[in-house]
From Swiss-Prot:
Boundaries of every Cache domain copy: 37-262
Residues passing through the membrane, by range: 11-31, 280-300
Protein name: Methyl-accepting chemotaxis protein PctC
Periplasmic side: 32-279
Biological role: Chemotactic-signal transducers respond to changes in the concentration of attractants and repellents in the environment, transduce a signal from the outside to the inside of the cell, and facilitate sensory adaptation through the variation of the level of methylation. Responds to L-His, L-Pro and gamma-aminobutyrate (GABA). Also involved in repellent responses to trichloroethylene (TCE), chloroform and methylthiocyanate. Also mediates chemotaxis to histamine, but does not bind histamine.
Keyword Transmembrane helix: yes
InterPro entries: dCache_1, HAMP_dom, MCPsignal_dom, Sensor-like_sf, T_SNARE_dom
Topological domains, Cytoplasmic: 1-10, 301-632
Location of this chain's protein in the cell: Cell inner membrane
Keyword ATP-binding: no
Length: 632
């Protein structure tokens, strides 16, 4: 799918991925920072609220502890610590306003005096109660953990302090406090319904809790999946499938006990603002991506215009009319400008090479046409030579008949000698004409050989030019391959350049294939030219032999003429001369027959040469057609 996308779309896709990745990283980082900030703010908030709540509880308890200490001091100063005086001290309004009850358990008798009065169970002995024994053991004011009152059955909290009168232990004075005030202090922390507060001891026992079912239970029972450690700070726990923040703040200044105010806040509620911010950030990211893509698309369209023009020019050369006159307009000095300059230089070199090949192809076509014309002329001359040779053969036959007639009729020797003289003169002229024709044929064959040799040399030059073209194609292919390798090393940023390099390499490969086809045609043309040269050389050799034979025939006809001229003076040796003449005529007839045979072979060779020249002309036309496919 990615291969079918254009380079600009790939850049847009990559940019979109980069922008989305960058904004995603920003959102994640900002979410992390916001989460940390919210957690820090939550910790600070819970710490401040916990400290304030612990301080309120501490202040409330310290005021009651001062009242218990004052009660103990008043009881210690009694002149007569009897029950009436003790009751009088316990009945003071300040105690009734701040305590549910105040009382004294005497050490000596176990008497229990309480105001307001409330009947205790039968056999009740204060000296066996925890508030009594713990205060006596500590020998100072203590605060007990909440417990169930033996008289009312209510959950209360007690403060007790040993009382000494005149150096002797009088008993332990104590005050009971109901937990409504502490519960009200804790329940005032609602956190808009997202949390609550409770009181816990350092041992993990829950002293006060909005859920009454958890009072006096341990944290392990309240948090079965993992109880938080009771140390100052904020902890994250899981309860009923939801995560909660739990902070512990110690209540300072309590003698004998260590209590902590525990604040619980729902984590999702604390992070609710983050969800809104995250949604807003995602929407902003989508808007930013769309806007950036639109702007980047327009910018890429402008920046990619040189590359688009380059691709269109390459397509015109590869699939259009092969117009090598087109050049790219260089408007910048960047990578596109460098690539455009390189493309223009490459097309310029191809243009010059094709132009030279075109000129050579035209010259080759012209030379081939000249060779064809010369071969046609040679064919006409060969026909004329054949006719002349037939005439000579007929004359020789007549000469032989005349010689036989001389032998049969010596009386008519002079007359026949005269006729023979005339015929010999005619034969000599024919032979001289034949010699001249053979010389002209030899010269034309020599010229044809020279032209074919020149044609062969030019085809070699064309082959050298094609070798240069093939070298250029191979070098271009190598450069394109190196460019593709460098683009692969550059990764996504170099894919567009890799596509261009691949197209250049394809063009170089096609140019190399065309050069190889032309090279093959030139090689076939060279083979035909060499065959034509060999044939013309053979024809020239036969022509020279024909000239030599014709010269010999001329010489012999001259001898015949001279002998016929002497017939009148040598009539006595007619018989002998006639026999010699017959032998010479037979020999001449054989020579003429051989000349005729050689002439026929020469005609056949010329026909073969003509066919080779026609093939040469055809190949030259094909080469010219291939070159004309380019616009130069």
């Amino acid at each position: 799918m990615l291969r079918s996308l254009s380079f600009a779309k790939k850049i847009l896709l990559a940019a979109a991925l980069v922008v989305v990745f960058a904004f995603s990283c920003f959102i994640l980082y900002n979410d992390y920072r916001q989460r940390e900030a919210v957690r820090t703010d939550t910790e600070n908030y819970l710490g401040e609220i916990g400290t304030l709540t612990a301080s309120n509880i501490q202040s409330w308890l310290e005021g009651r502890m001062h009242l218990v200490e004052g009660l103990a001091s008043q009881l210690a100063l009694l002149d007569q610590p009897d029950e009436a005086n003790i009751a009088r001290q316990l009945e003071q309004p300040v105690f009734s306003r701040n305590f549910a009850s105040v009382y004294l358990g005497e050490a000596a008798s176990g008497t229990f005096t309480m105001r307001p009065y409330d009947a205790m169970p039968e056999g009740y002995d204060p000296r066996t109660r925890a508030w009594y024994k713990d205060a006596l053991a500590a020998d100072r004011l203590i605060v007990t953990e909440p417990f169930v009152d033996a008289g009312t059955g209510e959950q209360i909290l007690a403060m007790s302090l040993p009382v000494r009168h005149a150096g002797q232990l009088l008993g332990v004075a104590a005050g009971d406090m109901k937990l409504e005030t502490l519960t009200a202090i804790l329940n005032s922390l609602k956190f808009d319904g997202a949390g609550y507060a409770f009181l816990v001891s350092d041992a993990g026992k829950i002293l006060l809790h909005p859920d009454s079912g958890l009072v006096l239970k341990t944290l392990a029972e309240a948090y079965p999946k993992g109880a938080p450690n009771i140390v100052p700070g904020v902890h994250e726990v899981e309860l009923d499938g939801s995560s909660q923040f739990v902070s512990f703040t110690p209540v300072k200044g309590l003698p004998g006990v260590t209590w902590y105010v525990a604040l619980v806040l729902d984590r999702d509620t604390a992070y609710s603002m983050l969800s809104e911010f995250r949604t807003s950030a995602i929407v902003a990211t989508l808007i930013a991506v769309v806007g950036i893509m639109l702007l980047l698309g327009m910018l890429i369209r402008v920046l990619m215009q040189p590359l688009t023009d380059m691709g269109r020019a390459m397509q015109d050369i590869a699939q259009g009319e092969g117009d090598l006159t087109k050049r790219l307009k260089v408007t910048s000095n960047d990578e596109f400008g460098t690539l455009a300059n390189a493309f223009n230089r490459f097309v310029e070199r191809i243009h010059e090479s094709i132009r030279e090949v075109a000129g050579t192809a035209r010259q080759l076509h012209d030379v081939a046409q000249l060779v064809v014309n010369a071969s046609n002329s040679s064919m006409a001359n060969s026909d004329e030579q054949s006719n002349r040779t037939n005439s000579v053969a007929a004359a020789i036959n007549e000469l032989g008949a005349a010689a036989q007639e001389i032998a049969r009729n010596a009386a008519d020797a002079s007359h026949h000698a005269s006729d023979a003289n005339h015929q010999a003169e005619d034969g000599k002229q024919v032979v001289e004409q034949t010699i001249r024709a053979m010389n002209e044929l030899s010269e034309k064959i020599s010229a044809s050989c020279a032209n074919i040799e020149a044609l062969n040399s030019r085809t070699v030059n064309i082959g050298q030019i094609l070798e240069v073209i093939k070298g250029i194609s191979e070098q271009t292919n190598l450069l394109a391959l190196n460019a593709a390798i460098e683009a692969a090393r550059a990764g996504e940023a170099g894919r567009g350049f890799a596509v261009v390099a691949d197209e250049v390499r394809n063009l170089a490969h096609r140019a190399q294939e065309s050069a190889q086809q032309i090279q093959k045609m030139i090689e076939e043309l060279q083979v035909g030219a060499r065959e034509a040269v060999a044939t013309m050389t053979e024809s020239q050799r036969y022509s020279l032999e024909s000239v030599e034979i014709a010269n010999r025939a001329g010489e012999r006809l001259g001898s015949v003429t001279s002998r016929i001229g002497e017939i009148d003076s040598m009539n006595q040796s007619v018989a002998t001369a006639t026999e010699e003449q017959t032998a010479v005529v037979d020999s001449l007839n054989m020579d003429i027959t051989e000349i005729n045979t050689l002439n026929q072979e020469g005609v056949e060779n010329l026909q073969a040469t003509l066919r080779a020249c026609g093939e040469l002309e055809t190949q030259a036309g094909r080469l010219r057609h291939l070159v004309d496919s380019f616009k130069i």
